[in-house]
C-alpha cells in the first residue's frame, strides 16, 4: 500500500529559520545585592535575554506560520514536511513563492534598520544597556539566520525502507487528528455559544472538506464524510446565517469532525449525523375542554314532507 500511496503524494518541506533576537544570560548581567548569589549551574539555568525588540521580528514569525497553514490546508504532516496530493500542489506553489518574496522584503528592511532597532531597544531599557550591547550579534550573523525557502520532491522508498511503511500507513490517522484539531478550533472560535452559524464560519469548514477530499485515498473511511458534507452544503443558504434544522445538522457535522473516533465510526456506517441532532419536541396535547371548544356542530340535512303527493280518493267517505 505504501508505494501506491506515495505515488499520489509530493512532499513539501518548508525551510525557514528566524533569528531569535535572544542571547544567553550571563552572571555579569545581574546586579546582586551584598551577600546575594546566583544558584549553581546544576540547580538552575540563567535562561536568555532579549537583545532586540520582538515586535521587529513579528513579520517573520507571521510568514512562517502562514506557509505552514497553507500546507496544512491541503496536506498532512509527514517526516518533517507535508505530504500533499500531487493534483493539489499547484494550489500552494504560487502562494509559497509570494511568502518567500515578502520574507525577503521584510528581511532587507530589518537589516537596513538593524542599528536603529537595537539602539531603540537599548534606550528603552537603560538599566540593562551594557548587558544588551555586549550581547548584540553582528549584522552578518543576523543575515544568515533569517532564511526562507521550500522544496518539493517525490519520495521513492528503498528496498530496505525501515519503518517507512508504518509511517505511510499512519497518515490516515494523522489526517483525522489534524481535521479534528481544526474543527475544534472552528467550534471554539465561531460556533460555541451561538444559535446560528454565519457564512464566514462556513469557509474553514469547506476547506476541511477539500482537505479530506484530496486525501481520501489515505483511508477508506474518509469518503463517506466528504459525501455527507457535500449533501449538507448544497442545502445551505447562499446568503445569511444558517439557522433552525440546518443549523443543528451543521453542528452535528462539526461534532463528528472534531473527534477522530467519531469520523471513523461515521465512515464505517456506525454513526449517522442525524443521531447527534436534537429530536424535535412533541407538541403538547390539548386539554379536553380546549378540544371541545374546537368542535363544531356538523349541520344535518332537513327532511321536508312531500306535500305535493296525491291523496287517494278512498280516504274520503
Regions found by a protein language model. Give the residues of each.
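C-terminal structured domains
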Residues: 202-317
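Context-gated lysine
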Residues: 8, 23-24, 41, 49-50, ...
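Long amphipathic alpha-helical segments with strong coiled-coil/leucine-zipper propensity
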Residues: 86-194
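Amphipathic alpha-helical interaction modules
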Residues: 38-61, 185-237
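A sequence-level detector of short, solvent-exposed, charge-rich linear segments
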Residues: 122, 129, 133, 190, ...
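Leu/Val/Ala/Ile-rich N-terminal alpha-helices, chiefly Sec-type signal peptides and the beginnings
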Residues: 1-136
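Amphipathic, heptad-repeat alpha-helices with coiled-coil/zipper character that mediate oligomerization
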Residues: 52-74, 137-148, 170, 174-181, ...
